[in-house]
């Protein structure tokens, strides 16, 4: 306790030593004002006040300055000061702005707010293009709080999760800061170099706060919050918003500012509510405070997200630019709840420096030398927004106990508690961990892989694993083994694999595996074991067709250059046909029987689907992520796909040295896929495939190309870009040239939000088209229309589609129930 108190005093003293201009900002009732903008007049040198109303403005030269205090809802205050030496204390008291309608001339023919917003919308593109390029300094602080943490989560104790929380199991979960240099070039180039990074409780941590994550420009038609949210000044904003003029006031430069209330026309549209402040005659944004619910944004964990932006005008540059931004949010999911905020301060804009396309490569984020090693002296000197008492306390507590938490005695004590073997571990799995040496070993629950098929009967798999993490570059060694036993065929099968990851920059992996397993003829696994178990036992439809594979395989994958990856394998395979060994069902239909285990001849029993054979198999696959950008962390490279460009896959597969020459083959394949947003019109995706075989007339069925079918009326994926939902699983399998197309458009509420009653449900309309063509067979097509985002409150894992199929005329239709949560279970 004494040690922490001493540290607290030292921190406060260091604040005093390095604060240049500092002070406290209150209202007329002496209440602290957070998020006040403080800057030097006619410059972009500034800061904001923290939650407790304190601020620090770092200046190097004693001189005469005019300091501006600007806060929404309060009159702007200017104070001219002459500084002879630092530190200098300057407090401010702000009076509430008298916002009135007295000076507004009301036209009874049209809402005055509509007139203002029409002019702002008409000027949107002009204002968007005013800023072509700049360099600036950027500061960010991210904080996430958690409240009332449950003692257990799915039976697991959360004691180690409690560090830094109070007696109510509440407190700061994450606290981090960055100081950066950023460069921008219109329309969408943004590059950031992080000079300093700090994470509470991790002296070696690198913050994930970035300028690109909060690059919200409301002059664009939409704002990207995972989904595209429509701006109140979008070209088509009047289709989504109503507006009300709440009043006007004059800023410190004499500009008339209109306060406009932003009102959603429909409560569940992807739109904001709140206030936007528009400068009269210039029709630019002066400030905004806009909120959106998690339901509107279709972000299940989020309750409310609020964005606050403040702008300042420079007479020198004749520009309005953003000087501060705050993002506040609240969340709740699975019993966890809390809130957080993200504070961003932009300063020292430079519009004169030449910034061109040559200034930008694919790297959008980098770190300076020793960015995570800056000491408290550095932070106390250059941090533009003072820490609150809560944040100071979190840094002191977590930094002081970090050494203890990383020590061997502490980690061993935690492991001793968590590694205790309990009787329930026999059924639900067990994990043993050595945290100090960073390795773990264990096995999974045999219940998680319990399933049924007509070849093995009831069967289960026991998976064993070992993993050793090696260093800060995220190298690791992973070893896995599995044993599967089928009761009906009375056969034990086993596999083993070894994976070594060399680093997290190019992500090279070396993989070795081998053993004996059952494998679906279509190795894309078109039907999951769980769904096949249900369809077999309850409906006597054994759609899964499998064979016995003995194999040994070596593989390697790596990113060669940014956006270009290779994946190659060489394998020995011995394939053997399998037969049904059980006809068990829960509900026996005398008019229905199980089909055989031969996909091509489901009504022929007792004859092998193919002759036992063996071969060597070589695969070389490449992936081109065109336009891919990336973030460079000292220990990692994080790739950022560019939705403006597609991803291209090209592959070559060769079967050779087969026990029978007929099983040798060559195959070339390609795939092109892309997903991109169309603003308020939703999201469009496509997936195109093509391939051809050579010398493949009599190859094994498992080497054919199989378009993924579905005969169960159940879907499990979030989209249907790789499946024909009304096609038998092996009806179009081919060993010749083929072309496959999947197209899907999600309107994201564009149409259903306009339908009375349906617009209350927050559903999304989805349409799709699918086609497959191969030699000597009439082309096959499917067309679908469906509703997505079905569920209750935050849990929206359901989707329903109606599908019609055609092949030389109408073939049939089906209703598909999308149970997306099955992906999580499996």
Where do the PLM segments sit?
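Residues that define the transmembrane beta-barrel architecture of outer-membrane proteins
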Residues: 305, 456-460, 490-494, 548-552, ...
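C-terminal outer-membrane beta-barrel translocator/porin domains of Gram-negative envelope proteins
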Residues: 509-530, 534-547, 607-608, 640, ...
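A short, solvent-exposed loop/turn motif at the edges and junctions
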Residues: 40-42, 68-78
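Structural motif
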Residues: 20-33
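Structured extracytoplasmic
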Residues: 98-99, 103-257, 263-271, 334-451, ...
């Amino acid at each position: 306790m004494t040690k922490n108190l001493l540290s607290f005093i030292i921190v406060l003293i260091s604040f005093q030593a390095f604060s240049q201009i500092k002070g406290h900002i209150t209202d007329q009732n002496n209440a602290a004002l957070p998020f006040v903008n403080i800057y030097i007049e006619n410059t972009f040198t500034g800061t904001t006040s923290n939650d407790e109303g304190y601020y620090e403005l770092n200046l190097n030269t004693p001189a005469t300055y005019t300091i501006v205090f600007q806060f929404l809802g309060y009159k702007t205050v200017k104070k001219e000061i002459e500084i002879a030496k630092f530190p200098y204390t300057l407090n401010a008291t702000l009076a509430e702005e008298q916002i009135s309608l007295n000076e507004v001339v009301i036209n009874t023919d049209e809402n005055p707010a509509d007139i203002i917003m029409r002019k702002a919308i008409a000027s949107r593109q002009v204002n968007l293009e005013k800023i072509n390029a700049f360099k600036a300094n950027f500061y960010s602080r991210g904080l996430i709080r958690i409240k009332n943490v449950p003692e257990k989560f799915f039976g697991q104790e959360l004691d180690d999760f409690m560090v830094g929380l109070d007696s109510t199991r509440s407190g700061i979960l994450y606290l981090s800061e960055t100081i950066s240099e950023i460069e921008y070039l219109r329309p969408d180039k943004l590059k950031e170099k992080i000079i300093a990074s700090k994470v509470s409780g991790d002296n070696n941590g690198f913050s994930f706060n970035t300028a690109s994550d909060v690059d919200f420009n409301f002059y664009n038609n939409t704002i990207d919050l995972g989904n595209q949210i429509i701006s109140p000044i979008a070209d088509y904003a009047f289709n989504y918003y109503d507006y009300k003029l709440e009043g006007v006031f004059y800023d410190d430069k004499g500009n008339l500012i209109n306060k406009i209330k932003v009102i959603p026309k429909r409560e569940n549209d992807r739109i904001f509510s709140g206030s936007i402040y528009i400068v009269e005659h210039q029709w630019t944004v002066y400030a905004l405070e806009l909120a959106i619910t998690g339901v509107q944004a279709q972000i299940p964990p989020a309750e409310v997200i609020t964005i606050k932006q403040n702008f300042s005008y420079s007479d020198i540059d004749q520009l309005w630019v953003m000087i501060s931004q705050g993002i506040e949010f609240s969340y709740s999911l699975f019993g966890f709840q809390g809130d957080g905020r993200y504070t961003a301060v932009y300063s020292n804009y430079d519009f004169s420096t030449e910034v061109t396309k040559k200034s930008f490569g694919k790297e959008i984020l980098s770190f300076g030398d020793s960015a995570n090693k800056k000491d408290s002296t550095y932070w106390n000197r250059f941090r533009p927004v003072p820490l609150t008492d809560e944040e100071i306390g979190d840094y002191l507590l977590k930094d002081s106990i970090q050494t203890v938490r990383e020590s061997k005695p502490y980690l061993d004590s935690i492991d001793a508690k968590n590694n205790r073997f309990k009787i329930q571990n026999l059924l639900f799995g067990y994990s043993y961990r050595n945290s100090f040496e960073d390795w773990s070993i264990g096995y999974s629950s045999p219940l998680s892989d319990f399933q049924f098929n007509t070849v093995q009967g009831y069967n289960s798999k026991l998976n064993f694993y070992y993993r050793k993490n090696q260093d800060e570059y995220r190298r690791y060694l992973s070893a896995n083994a599995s044993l599967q036993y089928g009761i009906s065929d009375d056969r034990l099968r086993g596999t083993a694999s070894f994976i070594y990851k060399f680093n997290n920059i190019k992500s090279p992996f070396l993989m070795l595996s081998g053993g004996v397993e059952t494998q679906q003829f279509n190795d894309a696994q078109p039907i999951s074991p769980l769904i096949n178990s249900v369809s077999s036992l309850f409906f006597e439809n054994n759609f899964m067709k499998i064979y016995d594979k003995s194999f040994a395989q070596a593989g390697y994958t790596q990113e060669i250059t940014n956006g270009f990856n290779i994946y190659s394998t060489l394998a020995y395979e011995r394939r053997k046909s399998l037969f049904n060994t059980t006809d068990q069902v829960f509900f026996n239909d005398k008019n229905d029987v199980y089909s055989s285990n031969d996909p091509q001849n489901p009504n022929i029993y007792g004859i092998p689907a193919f002759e036992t054979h063996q071969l060597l198999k070589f695969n070389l696959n490449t992936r081109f992520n065109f336009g891919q950008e990336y973030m460079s962390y000292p220990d990692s490279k994080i790739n950022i796909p560019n939705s403006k460009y597609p991803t291209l896959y090209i592959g070559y597969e060769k079967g050779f040295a087969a026990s029978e020459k007929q099983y040798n083959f060559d195959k070339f394949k390609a795939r092109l896929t892309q997903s991109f947003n169309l603003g308020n019109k939703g999201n469009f995706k496509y997936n195109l495939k093509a391939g051809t075989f050579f010398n493949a007339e009599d190859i094994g069925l498992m080497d054919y190309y199989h378009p993924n079918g579905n005969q169960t009326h159940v879907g499990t994926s979030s989209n249907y870009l790789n499946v024909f939902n009304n096609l038998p699983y092996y009806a179009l399998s081919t060993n010749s040239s083929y072309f496959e197309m999947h197209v899907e458009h999600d309107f994201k509420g564009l149409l259903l939000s306009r339908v009375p009653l349906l617009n209350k449900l927050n559903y999304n309309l989805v349409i799709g088209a699918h086609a497959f063509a191969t030699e000597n067979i009439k082309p096959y097509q499917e067309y679908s229309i469906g509703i997505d985002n079905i569920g209750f409150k935050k849990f929206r894992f359901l989707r329903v589609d109606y599908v019609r199929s055609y092949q030389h005329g109408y073939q049939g239709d089906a209703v598909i129930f999308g149970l997306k949560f099955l992906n999580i279970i499996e």
